[in-house]
A protein has these predicted regions:
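N-terminal Rossmann-like FAD-binding beta1-loop-alpha1 element of flavoenzymes
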Residues: 5-31
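Helical element adjacent to the flavin cofactor pocket in flavoenzyme catalytic cores
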Residues: 149, 153-184, 200-201, 207
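Conserved FAD/dinucleotide-binding core of flavoprotein oxidoreductases
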Residues: 263-313
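Helix-loop-beta segment of a Rossmann-like dinucleotide-binding subdomain
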Residues: 131-161, 196, 204-205, 274-285
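Flavin (primarily FAD) binding-site architecture
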Residues: 212-227
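Glycine-rich FAD pyrophosphate-binding loop
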Residues: 24-46
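A conserved short coil-to-beta-strand element within the FAD-binding core of flavoproteins
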Residues: 179-195
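Dinucleotide-binding Rossmann-like beta1-alpha1 core, especially the glycine-rich loop
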Residues: 46-134
Length: 313
């Protein structure tokens, strides 16, 4: 078995830099890590939600939670609140909380809920997190240690700021080498194993292990290894998204402690609350609705909370 001495990561953003940090923490500088990314490919930053498992990942790479919250415009996410997915009525809501109900693994809680006559929404009966989250309370207090909690949570983060923080952390803590450049091709040995990536301008980056974080471009897994894209269109028909940043009306407006997910005629709208703004987007099927109509749907949604003038801007 070959010894890994140099890992090359192709692609940056949250995926690339989180990979770099995770490998850096595992390697303890036993091997070198280089990340190459194109300076002309921006990180998409409309607001991003994570699962609670992100806490363990950030702990593993030694990143301060308080620094994350301060630097990434972050808020704490306690689940996802779904609006209008069944009947579309005003009271048609369902919360997927991140704290598991007590005894969920040993008892059928739905049966107890049914016996009680279905008087209250299921999420209100099985976990206290529903009340905490929907009244905009936090799952922990300000003096709770990093990553400890009373109720489980993930994060809402600004993806651009999150990638920048991970980059700084990977370079300073783990010595990751950062290269800006466009990958023009790859080289491989007789067995087909990658040996280097070639950059525009003639430079190359040699390595023993390569990680493809180039997203849909699939510069290694697609262009070199010819692994085809596997569509899930038959079960996930939505294929486009229009996105926007939405300001708060007032600096002290409440920040939603859950991702909001609102059903629409041809898809759904996400609404993620950061400290300084919201990130919203309409995921839809472009075969069923035009981009202009999808954009108008998103604008109408924004108008409900910030008014027509702000939404129009």
């Amino acid at each position: 078995m070959r010894t890994t001495e140099h890992v090359v990561i192709v692609g940056g953003g949250t995926a690339g830099w989180l990979t770099a940090a995770r490998l850096g923490a595992m390697a303890d500088r036993r091997f070198d890590i280089t990340l190459v990314e194109s300076p002309s490919v921006p990180t998409v930053g409309v607001g991003e939600g994570t699962w609670p498992s992100m806490k363990a990942t950030l702990q593993a790479i030694g990143l301060s939670e308080r620094l994350l919250i301060a630097e990434c415009d972050a808020s704490l996410k306690q689940g996802t609140l779904f609006h209008g997915w069944r009947t579309g009525a005003a009271d048609d809501t369902y919360l997927h909380p991140f704290s598991l109900p007590p005894e969920y693994a040993s008892k059928n809680l739905a049966e107890y809920w049914r016996r009680d006559g279905l008087r209250y929404p299921f999420h209100e009966v099985v976990t206290p997190q529903a009340l905490i989250a929907t009244t905009h309370k936090a799952p922990k207090t300000a003096d709770t240690p990093d990553y400890a909690f009373a109720l489980n949570y993930g994060y809402h983060v600004d993806a651009v700021k999150f990638a920048a923080l991970l980059r700084q952390h990977s370079i300073s803590k783990f010595g990751v080498r950062h290269v800006e450049g466009h990958v023009a091709g790859v080289s491989s040995d007789a067995a087909g194993f990658l040996t280097s990536v070639e950059l525009e301008g003639g430079n190359s980056l040699s390595g023993d292990f390569f990680v493809d974080c180039s997203g849909q471009k699939a510069l290694l897994i697609g262009d070199h290894f010819k692994v085809p894209f596997e569509s899930a269109r038959q079960v996930l028909p939505n294929n486009r998204a229009v996105v926007a940043h939405v300001p708060y009306n007032e600096p002290n407006d409440e920040i939603h402690s859950c991702t909001q997910s609102s059903a629409q005629d041809c898809g759904w709208i996400w609404d993620i609350g950061l400290q300084s703004r919201r990130g919203i987007g309409y995921v839809h099927n472009a075969d069923l609705v035009s981009e202009a109509d999808a954009t108008q749907t998103l604008r109408n949604y924004a108008e409900q909370s910030v008014g027509a003038k702000v939404a129009g801007d």
